[in-house]
Design a protein with these regions (language model features):
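Histidine-centered active-site loop/cap adjacent to the catalytic His
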Residues: 1-3, 182-197
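Short hydrophobic segments within beta-strands
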Residues: 3-4, 36, 127
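Conserved SGNH/GDSL esterase-like catalytic core that processes O-acyl groups on lipids
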Residues: 7-106
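Extracytoplasmic/secreted cell-surface and envelope-processing proteins
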Residues: 10-12, 93-102, 132-142, 176-181
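Stable alpha-helical elements in mature extracytoplasmic
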Residues: 14, 18, 68, 72, ...
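Loop/turn elements at helix/coil->beta-strand transitions in domains of secreted/extracellular proteins
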Residues: 29-34, 80-86, 118-125, 161-167
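Active-site segments of SGNH/GDSL-like serine hydrolases
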Residues: 88-93, 112-146, 170-172
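Substrate-gating cap/lid alpha-helix
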Residues: 129-170, 188-192
Length: 197
């Protein structure tokens, strides 16, 4: 289950999601898999190796951690129990003028709890998110961004169990402005970069 906001949903042709590039990599690998989620975008994706792109996902543009926390139980029940959840840009759309940073971390932990409650053997991969365009990186932004990059590692370590592996993946190192279609969303190069991580 690809879970998150607009970087998961994509909005072709304006900007890309990593899902199509990841899907092609998985098809090439020969791994049997099925993307899950209650969302399904209508963008045009070319067939690959004679197969049609699996469009299912759980990405919603603009959604914040409180909204994901509120919706996750219903989405999991509707879409089916995932074996693997790819949790993109946790906290990325949270406005810290209306929610505390500690509440964002509580939401991320609660989202992981909800996934583990429905599948105690789930593998949960939490992004250390790729940064936005350099000109968007104010000192205030960087203070929060750098902190959450570290805090999701702590969350993953604490939330891992003997049956449910929670891990992080570094999407930030090596990511450049040339991989963005606008201030925050991926272009094709950015989508490929994220998919290969």
């Amino acid at each position: 289950m690809p879970l998150g906001a607009s970087r998961v949903a994509g909005a072709r042709p304006e900007y890309e999601s990593y899902r199509y590039e990841l899907w092609k990599l998985l098809v090439n690998s020969g791994i049997e898999f099925d993307f899950t989620g209650t969302e399904n975008d209508g963008a045009n994706y070319p067939n690959f190796n004679g197969l049609s792109f699996d469009r299912d996902h759980e990405g919603r543009g603009g959604i914040n951690s409180s909204e994901i926390r509120s919706g996750i139980d219903a989405w999991l029940r509707e879409s089916g129990v995932p074996d693997i959840v790819l949790f993109s840009s946790p906290g990325g759309n949270d406005d810290l003028t209306s929610i505390t940073y500690e509440s964002v971390l509580d939401n991320i932990n609660a989202i992981v709890d909800a996934i583990q409650a429905i599948n105690p053997e789930a593998t949960i991969i939490i992004e250390q998110a790729a940064p936005p365009m350099t000109n968007e990186q104010t000192s205030e932004f960087l203070a929060v961004y750098n902190q959450i990059i570290q805090d999701v590692v702590t969350i993953a370590e604490r939330q891992s169990t003997t049956t449910s592996k929670v891990m992080t993946v570094d999407m930030a190192t090596g990511f450049t402005d040339a991989m963005l279609a606008d201030d925050v969303h991926y272009n094709e190069a950015g989508a490929r970069f994220i998919a290969t991580r």
